[in-house]
Amino acid sequence: MITELHGIDIRENEPLKHYTYTKVGGPADFLAFPRNHYELSRIVAYANKENMPWLVLGNASNLIVRDGGIRGFVIMFDKLNAVHLNGYTLKAEAGANLIETTKIAKFHSLTGFEFACGIPGSIGGAVFMNAGAYGGEISHIFLSAKVLTPSGEIKTISARDMAFGYRHSAIQETGDIVISAKFALKPGNYDTISQEMNRLNHLRQLKQPLEFPSCGSVFKRPPGHFAGQLIMEANLKGHRIGGVEVSEKHAGFMINVADGTAKDYEDLIAYVIETVENHSGVKLEPEVRIIGENL
């Protein structure tokens, strides 16, 4: 118990595998669940005062936490999840579930968010990664974000300052953490929006191994190629290290089939990169983030 942070939900030495989509990850020294921006500011101020590292995990979807865990504070935004509409502008806190947010837009017959209807994760993580699928991406609808700087200051960042690129945003370099974001949507037809979301979800279910824990798409799309196709051509479908294997359903995914570890994921990623480069001459670049310490 940290007396200066009394009243905030903080768990000591908490295994992160219980919170990640991959079902791997060692313990966080302190895992915190702030309920509002005030509690978040208190946590960050305390960590900075004590020279303790801190980071935000979001919904921990496109992420691998190493088996040794993470030192200092890990902050999760599960309780910072409010979504509000003001006309055609949707504002969501960073912890809002991305899929549920697209459903809110649909309910109000607002179009623009359909592409994200099956992407796991949080609003904050989606902005950080410029998440996208089926021709759409966050940058197409993004207006602005309120962020927390590493020093604990809260400021607003515009779409221009985000400098979005493919699976990239400026805050990947600055260390700023999204705490809320605004998106510009357009009036649409409920049935049309619903049909498009059903179509995209059907495609996702057909092509992706949703029945297993995974970190989502492992590699960025190399120019002129598809990562999954290159992996398949290198005869790596079903290749397994420890409890993690390249999905038979979609070679761009790695799934946890038998109590795999973060080391299994890292070893398999390295093996796939090397094998594909030897086979095709293309060096794959991971899209998934890998953080934390090894055992």
UniProtKB/Swiss-Prot annotation:
Cell compartment(s), UniProt: Cytoplasm
Catalyzed reactions per annotation: UDP-N-acetyl-alpha-D-muramate + NADP(+) = UDP-N-acetyl-3-O-(1-carboxyvinyl)-alpha-D-glucosamine + NADPH + H(+)
Transmembrane portions of the chain: none
Gene3D superfamilies for this protein: 3.30.465.10, UDP-N-acetylenolpyruvoylglucosamine reductase, C-terminal domain, Uridine Diphospho-n-acetylenolpyruvylglucosamine Reductase, domain 2
GO terms of molecular function: FAD binding; UDP-N-acetylmuramate dehydrogenase activity
Domain FAD-binding PCMH-type as annotated: residue spans: 23-188
Cellular component, GO, one term: cytosol
GO biological process terms held by the UniProt record: cell division; cell wall organization; peptidoglycan biosynthetic process; regulation of cell shape
UniProt keyword terms in alphabetical order: Cell cycle, Cell division, Cell shape, Cell wall biogenesis/degradation, Cytoplasm, FAD, Flavoprotein, NADP, Oxidoreductase, Peptidoglycan synthesis
InterPro entries, sorted: FAD-bd_PCMH, FAD-bd_PCMH-like_sf, FAD-bd_PCMH_sub1, FAD-bd_PCMH_sub2, MurB, MurB_C, MurB_C_sf, Oxid_FAD_bind_N
EC numbers, comma separated: 1.3.1.98
Pathway(s) of this molecule: Cell wall biogenesis; peptidoglycan biosynthesis
Active site: 167, 217 (proton donor), 287
Cofactor: FAD
Main localization, broad class: cytoplasm
Family as reported in the entry's similarity comment: Belongs to the MurB family.
Function: Cell wall formation.
Entry protein name: UDP-N-acetylenolpyruvoylglucosamine reductase
Origin species: Streptococcus pyogenes serotype M12 (strain MGAS2096)
Organism phylogeny: Bacteria, Bacillati, Bacillota, Bacilli, Lactobacillales
Gene name per UniProt: murB
